[in-house]
């Protein structure tokens, strides 16, 4: 946190690149970024404000900038007040907290604005009051901005000058998506897998004529990841086809998952139908 206080940090989501600057003046084309006020809490957590539309207009809603949150927005119903029911709503496990699972609802609102940039029909999450009763919500915080919104921008956190900069990237107009399958996949452990290679040996016979022969030998061992299902959302597609907790995931659309990263798997099940899943 002390490091963030001293140097502007740029996160380029589309290039998956983080750049640390000596000062904000060192950022090229900084004039193309929109700047917004950045409030820093005593715990060095960054906050900014957004507006959103959902039957009513909600302005200057203070949000934690949470780069560890994979959702778009978390809205705290008990802090906002008068939040209308979401569109296309369903219950889900939103994540894990110190006291266990964080449950709530996911759905759609009309739009949200990050500065002058308007995002249409963002998918959002509303945690149950019971799930966040031990969360220390203070300083008039209304929720969190997560990576499903942040990834559509290049952002700069300038703690020293208390400014948050953002500029849309090539993913800005992407349709918002969520994990359609209803599965929570985790990396469980590794296993050893061996490969075989064909090795050719040249040999001479007594008449000095060369001939060759081939043999298969085990030549390389590699650690391959094992993925399993940690949770299945109630009434989800995954549950309907019979997938269960602790099932081992073997293939996605015919492809061995031990050749994929966890990010690859999560991206796949967020955009594909559960019929591609096999256990």
Describe the residue ranges of each PLM region:
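Pepsin/retropepsin-fold aspartyl endopeptidases
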Residues: 1-279
